[in-house]
Amino acid sequence: MSTTVTLTSSDGVDLTVDRDVAERSVLIKNMLEDLGESGEAIPIPNVNEVVLKKVIEWCTHHKNDPPSTGDDDDSRRKTTDIDEWDQKFMQVDQEMLFEIILAANYLDIKALLDVGCKTVANMIKGKSPEEIRKTFNIQNDFTPEEEDQIRRENEWAEE
């Protein structure tokens, strides 16, 4: 069994990766099982080279982590705590952060998806809607009347 696999990014760049690193992705693991020992490059059509390298960096750091136990991992989902290495890893611009989240979702890397989503949750935590809009450059498309109506309908949530 080959110890490395070749992944082809959406922009056509081949990256050679240790098999155990690549198999942090459920999608790639399943593709490798289907392909057998063909040695063919695995196309990753939704992820460009820069993002794929970043994902590989994360997978390399976490290659010895125990596999995710899936949805029954409630304690993991109820907290927004992120370990120090992952916090530093996620200190990227917003576009890259969202690209990493999309790639983790596409590649089925639950732990990386969790870290990305927790990073976004921490960016939102404790902020007003106006501050959140500013953080993510979101245009407010409600009229003042609509905002008042929404506030009245949701008064109970602010108690």
From Swiss-Prot:
SUPFAM superfamilies on file: POZ domain, Skp1 dimerisation domain-like
GO molecular function annotations of the record: DNA replication origin binding; ubiquitin protein ligase activity
Pathway connected to this protein: Protein modification; protein ubiquitination
Listed InterPro entries: SKP1, SKP1-like, SKP1-like_dim_sf, SKP1/BTB/POZ_sf, Skp1_comp_dimer, Skp1_comp_POZ
UniProt-annotated stretches for the region Interaction with the F-box domain of F-box proteins: 101-159
Keywords from the named record: Ubl conjugation pathway
Matching Pfam families: Skp1 (PF01466), Skp1_POZ (PF03931)
Keyword Protease: no
Record-level GO BP terms: exit from mitosis; G1/S transition of mitotic cell cycle; G2/M transition of mitotic cell cycle; kinetochore assembly; mitotic nuclear membrane biogenesis; negative regulation of cytoplasmic translation; negative regulation of mitotic metaphase/anaphase transition; positive regulation of D-glucose transmembrane transport
Gene Ontology CC terms, in alphabetical order: CBF3 complex; kinetochore; nuclear SCF ubiquitin ligase complex; RAVE complex; single-stranded DNA-dependent ATP-dependent DNA helicase complex
Biological function: Essential component of the SCF (SKP1-CUL1-F-box protein) E3 ubiquitin ligase complexes, which mediate the ubiquitination and subsequent proteasomal degradation of target proteins. Controls sulfur metabolite repression, probably by mediating the inactivation or degradation of the metR transcription factor.
Oligomer status and interactors: Component of the SCF (SKP1-CUL1-F-box protein) E3 ubiquitin ligase complexes.
Family under the similarity heading: Belongs to the SKP1 family.
Protein name: E3 ubiquitin ligase complex SCF subunit sconC
Organism: Aspergillus clavatus (strain ATCC 1007 / CBS 513.65 / DSM 816 / NCTC 3887 / NRRL 1 / QM 1276 / 107)
Higher taxonomy: Eukaryota, Fungi, Dikarya, Ascomycota, Pezizomycotina
Gene name, Swiss-Prot/TrEMBL: sconC
